[in-house]
Amino acid sequence: MKNEKMKNKESGGSVLITGASGFIGSFLVEEAVRRGFDTWAGVRATSSRAYLQDPRIHFLELDFGKPDVLRRQLTGHGRFDYIVHCAGVIKCIDPADFERMNHRQTCDFIDALRELDLVPRQFIFISTLSVFGPVHERTYEPICDSDTPCPDTAYGRSKLKTEQYLQRLEGFPYVIFRPTGVYGPRERDYYLMAQSIRRHVDVAAGFRRQDLTSVYVADVVQAVFLAIGKGVARRAYFLSDGQVYSSRTFSDLLIREMGNPWVIRLKLPLFALKIVSLCAEWWAKRRKKASTLNRDKYHIMKQRNWRCDTGPAVRELGYAPAYDLDRGVRLTVAWYKENGWL
């Protein structure tokens, strides 16, 4: 064991990945282990470890909701070389939970690291393109860092506030990634689209042109480790696969890979989508569940321009996305089938 730890230390140092049981987090853990990092999966006591079975993974339980407990948990381990913060929520029963869990708890985490003298070499924060909201909706220009954020979702606002907090901390070694829609094996929101296609129904929203972007989960992981390798700090990067797609491209690829002979295509006007979204959210709240279709999802589907400028990531990190949508959907559907999801 001592030799193994020394090997890991020499290979890359120690890395803590919060939200490790989640979609992006579990792939980051796998890649960290593969690269020889001393890999720590930050999880809740109740988190599933289904995708964290490698015996080389160490676990650290973190209670972000209790700052005093969190400080004891962090002190018990000591400083990590790198922290990749994936923990957070993408849908909630109460929209106020976005503020509490994505913003305030992340700020408490950062404050604890600073107060305990546990600041890592890099603190990598997984944010979202949604922090900018609907920008260049008429011109369809790529969203870039010089644009003014105007998020119209509770999720986007919570992530933006955390970005702004990081940027105010003098000398804090943050790196921010703002991926567009991330898809791949283990992801459940895009999986709902596959389920709909399996039922021979494809639903789109709005009648005006919509430019969509996507990024396969492995390319997000690639970007994170490129940032670690380059040692960059106090930078923010957009991530996509570099391509722009129409609103039908994803569903067309699903139809092809799933071998569906026919599909009914429905295009809802935005006002109808809004009504359906609010009703779905209301019904889910009555059942004390978080609905995938909600007012945040309505604003996401309403947005027409999802182009973003990945140039800085390409130039500064050497980011080179390896998966376009064609390849990514093929691998994703294959995984769904192999794992009994389809």
Task: Show the residue positions of the predicted features.
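Mid/C-terminal beta-alpha module of Rossmann-like enzyme folds, strongest
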Residues: A227-T292, T310, D326, R330-L331
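Substrate-positioning beta->alpha
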Residues: R157, K161, E187-L192, A205-I228, ...
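Amphipathic terminal alpha-helices
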Residues: C308-E316, A320-L342
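Conserved Rossmann-fold NAD(P)-dependent oxidoreductase catalytic core, especially the SDR/UDP-sugar
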Residues: C107-A154
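Flexible, glycine-rich beta-alpha linker
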Residues: F132, V175-L192
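NAD(P)H-binding glycine-rich loop region in Rossmannoid oxidoreductase-like domains
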Residues: H58-R104, D108, P134
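Catalytic helix-loop patch of NAD(P)-dependent Rossmann-fold dehydrogenases
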Residues: H136-G181, D202-G206
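N-terminal Rossmann NAD(P)H-binding glycine-rich loop of SDR-like oxidoreductase domains
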Residues: V15-R35
